[in-house]
């Protein structure tokens, strides 16, 4: 079992505030439904945040990084050293998510949840049980104790962020090989073949995708994790940064903080989180559908519809960051528009 808190129930949606938001939307100076999904987004946030005025102003971004032993099987187009180099790039402000965080006014924290780095890095929070996972094609990626540590690292990151009273949280990831790990987790959770899930990741070609799928399918058989418990799956084929995000999602939901879900890898972490603690599901707000072919299946399993689809496949939390202005617009429109009565506008056609 994982730490006891992982299974604690999350708060329920405030029906009072959700229903009040529905009433307000019907009173705003626009035809019913004219703002499309932005209306429902504002209503959902009002219920999740238990407020009459949903907010998306304070949105910290937390990036979890980890390395993957499965890279030894030639599943990635880039060398493992890129993980550490990109962590330094995050910290120095040169990565895509660094630029987006500045543009959005979001605090960016980077957590080394399990990279191969042997040194403390300036601007990086180190919170890891080991240096990278084991190669899951030959042995289990993690022990239960290591998995539990990663969940606790995610909870600690959320506790730090919660001190600033955030309206939402965005989680991102970095780790060469983590699309393979995520595909293995998703295929195991969904009980489907890796061929249906595995995508190009950092840019492998068709032959590379086929090889990745074969490696994953063989590992699922080796460990006997097809449709197994999420705990068993995460130990067998998981990743430290992915496990940390699982823990962070549950910890955020338990604090009534909605999470704007990023792309394929974070969505897989979200699916595992929901399987572990179904009460966190309402707090997941999908941002985008990525170019990774398995993302659509994972979103369907989560029963959510993304806000945008721009063929992104960068990760880092970038898709969620790009979608955040839409969430802010939904809140601003809900809170700031005049009602028919305030504007002295007839509320129905003549």
UniProtKB/Swiss-Prot annotation:
S-S pairs: none
Family that this chain belongs to: Belongs to the CobT family.
Reactions it catalyzes: 5,6-dimethylbenzimidazole + nicotinate beta-D-ribonucleotide = alpha-ribazole 5'-phosphate + nicotinate + H(+)
Name the UniProt record assigns to this protein: Nicotinate-nucleotide--dimethylbenzimidazole phosphoribosyltransferase
GO MF annotations in UniProt: nicotinate-nucleotide-dimethylbenzimidazole phosphoribosyltransferase activity
Entry-linked NCBIfam families: cobT_DBIPRT, PRK00105.1
Gene3D superfamilies: 1.10.1610.10, 3.40.50.10210
One record GO biological process: cobalamin biosynthetic process
Superkingdom field: Bacteria
EC class (word): transferase
EC annotation from Swiss-Prot or TrEMBL: 2.4.2.21
Pathway: Nucleoside biosynthesis; alpha-ribazole biosynthesis; alpha-ribazole from 5,6-dimethylbenzimidazole: step 1/2
InterPro entries: Nict_dMeBzImd_PRibTrfase, Nict_dMeBzImd_PRibTrfase_bact, Nict_dMeBzImd_PRibTrfase_N, Nict_dMeBzImd_PRibTrfase_sf
Active site, UniProt feature: 316
Task performed by this protein: Catalyzes the synthesis of alpha-ribazole-5'-phosphate from nicotinate mononucleotide (NAMN) and 5,6-dimethylbenzimidazole (DMB).
Alphabetic keyword roster: Cobalamin biosynthesis, Glycosyltransferase, Transferase
A Pfam family: DBI_PRT
